[in-house]
Structure formats: structure tokens, C-alpha cells
């Protein structure tokens, strides 16, 4: 019997190619055109997106990207490439490709890269620890479209999420412990997850339950009392209600109530990006301190740390 050759596809959201209005506009147009992200009627959404949102948001968002841009590109791209390279070194006999739902490198280029290595089985690992239709679902949709155009289709193992994976929880816990050791134990550990519209959850997306699972498991691993750990949701967009409580409003409230020291972690982000480095580490720090808080630290994402790479290797091993 011929031995199966397996490849690994690491999938993430994507990023603009440059911190310029033009590049950001191209990226946002692709991102906000996906029905998994915004499912508003196209008759209403297209004019709003093209006539208002893209012209107004692109220059502002480009400035935010410029504030966190790294020598090798956006933080998400730099850390994602590091993850790909480190996992390939950890699994030298297994091709590892990186693909993004939006922007470059595309998911299609990642699939083609693996097929060029003559793999007949692909393990797809969306780097979203907590499932959501708007993230993991978008990877699934695009993968299906890509394979629909192929004459030969490899076997596919698709990892839905890993919200309560033991290695993942331990890696988070060790990162928190290191931060506590460096900065002192805070009055509160705030876990901020990317939000989604409340309507998506009402219609069946189990994302909030998966976030609660991670929060519960992490608090347990740390041995922290429930009242010392709080879960919030960030990065809301548009006018409809999103998952609550909102991170920025919660930080303002906590500062006003006299909570002095907070540390913030974003467990749903496998790699640091604009939403963590600018929104959480900078904007929300100003919100908390401006409301009366005294001390605020952001705990970095797991990025390409050895513990994170080992977690990925162990996670995909069950599907190889």
C-alpha cells in the first residue's frame, strides 16, 4: 500500500500588503465583501461599502497599520511566516504552507504549493482557537471553492477549533504566569476576544460558548478565582449589537470604579496584529488609564514561541 503524504495548511485572516490607503482599501474591499463577515443585503451593502466605508476608513486604518508595521511587513504576516517556518522545522518531513482568507498569500496559493509537493492529504489548521462562522467558516467556504476547480482532490482533515486543547491552555497559562512574574499579579486578568454580531450567535454560531470554554479552562489552569478573570469582546463594527460586554466600555468602567492594575490577554489571536498591538495595547490602555486606572499591561499573543509551535505540531499529529 502506498504511503500517504500529508501537508499542513496554516490559515489565518490576512493583512494589507502595505500600510497605505490603496493597499488597505484593496484588503478591506475583499474582507468586507465576504458574506461570512457581513451578510447584509448586497443591494444595501455595496453602495455603502464602496461609496462610504472604503473611502473614509482606508486612510485612517492605513495610519494605524503604519504605527505597528514591522520590517518584514505587518505583524500578522511576520508572525505567521515565523509560525510556518518553525512548524516546518519541527516537522521536517511534512510540507507546511501558509494561506490567508483575504490578501496574500491566498489560500489557493497555499493549496497549490502543497499539491506541487505531491501531497495527497492536507491537514487544514485555521489559526482561530474558537470557532466562528465568520472566520473558520470563511476558510471552509474558500477551501471548498478552490477544490471545486481541481480535477484531483486530496484528502482533507479540517480542524474546527481548539478552544479547550490542553497544550493551548497550558501555553496561555504559562504566558500569563510569565507576565505576572514580570509585572506583579494584577487586580484583574481581562481576556478580550474579537467580537461578532450578537445576531450571528442567536442564529447558531457557538463562538461565545467556545470563548467561555477557553476562559473557564484558562482560569482553572491558573488557579484563579472567577471574580479575578473577566471575558470581554473587542473590535465591533457597524451599528447592530455585538457580543457583550465590550472591551473598551468595560475598561472605562473598571478604571472609574477604582480598579488599579489590569493585565489583558487576547486568547483568540494566534498571532499579534493590528487589533492586539494597536487597539488593545495602545488605544484601550489609554481608555483604562484615562478613566482612573493606574497600571495596564498587554500580554502578547503566543506568536511563534516554541510552546505554541509544539502545540500546533501535537494538534495536527492526530490527523496526519
From Swiss-Prot:
GO terms for molecular function: ferrochelatase activity; metal ion binding. Its EC number is 4.98.1.1. GO terms for cellular component: cytoplasm. Pfam families: Ferrochelatase. One of its GO terms (biological process) is heme biosynthetic process. Pathway: Porphyrin-containing compound metabolism; protoheme biosynthesis; protoheme from protoporphyrin-IX: step 1/1. It catalyses: heme b + 2 H(+) = protoporphyrin IX + Fe(2+). The keyword Cell membrane does not apply. The keyword Transferase does not apply. Keywords: Cytoplasm, Heme biosynthesis, Iron, Lyase, Metal-binding, Porphyrin biosynthesis. Catalyzes the ferrous insertion into protoporphyrin IX. Monomer. Belongs to the ferrochelatase family. This is Ferrochelatase. It comes from Escherichia coli O157:H7.
Amino acid at each position: 500500500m502506498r504511503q500517504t503524504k500529508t501537508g499542513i495548511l496554516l490559515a489565518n485572516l490576512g493583512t494589507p500588503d502595505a500600510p497605505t490607503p490603496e493597499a488597505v482599501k484593496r484588503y478591506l474591499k475583499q474582507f468586507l465583501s465576504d458574506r461570512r463577515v457581513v451578510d447584509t443585503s448586497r443591494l444595501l451593502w455595496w453602495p455603502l461599502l464602496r461609496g462610504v466605508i472604503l473611502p473614509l476608513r482606508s486612510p485612517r486604518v492605513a495610519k494605524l497599520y503604519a504605527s505597528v508595521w514591522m520590517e518584514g511587513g505587518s505583524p500578522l504576516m511576520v508572525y505567521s511566516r515565523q509560525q510556518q517556518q518553525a512548524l516546518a522545522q519541527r516537522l521536517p518531513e511534512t510540507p507546511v504552507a501558509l494561506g490567508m482568507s483575504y490578501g496574500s498569500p491566498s489560500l489557493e496559493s497555499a493549496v497549490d504549493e502543497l499539491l506541487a509537493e505531491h501531497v495527497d492529504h492536507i491537514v487544514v489548521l485555521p489559526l482561530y482557537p474558537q470557532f466562528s462562522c465568520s472566520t473558520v467558516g470563511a476558510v471552509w467556504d474558500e477551501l471548498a471553492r478552490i477544490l471545486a476547480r481541481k480535477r484531483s482532490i486530496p484528502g482533507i482533515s479540517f480542524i474546527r477549533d481548539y478552544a479547550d486543547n490542553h497544550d493551548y491552555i497550558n501555553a496561555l497559562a504559562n504566558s500569563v504566569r510569565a507576565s505576572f512574574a514580570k509585572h506583579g499579579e494584577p487586580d484583574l486578568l481581562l481576556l478580550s476576544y474579537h467580537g461578532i454580531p450578537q445576531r450571528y450567535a442567536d442564529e447558531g454560531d457557538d463562538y461565545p460558548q467556545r470563548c467561555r470554554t477557553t476562559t473557564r479552562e484558562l482560569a482553572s489552569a491558573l488557579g484563579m478565582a472567577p471574580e479575578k478573570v473577566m471575558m470581554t469582546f473587542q473590535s465591533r463594527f457597524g451599528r447592530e449589537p455585538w457580543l457583550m460586554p465590550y472591551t473598551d466600555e468595560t475598561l472605562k468602567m473598571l478604571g472609574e470604579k477604582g480598579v488599579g492594575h489590569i493585565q489583558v490577554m487576547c486568547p483568540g489571536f494566534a498571532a499579534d496584529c493590528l487589533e492586539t498591538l494597536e487597539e488593545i495595547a495602545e488605544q484601550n490602555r489609554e481608555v483604562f488609564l484615562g478613566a482612573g486606572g493606574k497600571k495596564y499591561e498587554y500580554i502578547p499573543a503566543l506568536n511563534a514561541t516554541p510552546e505554541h509551535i509544539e502545540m500546533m505540531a501535537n494538534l495536527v499529529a492526530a490527523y496526519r
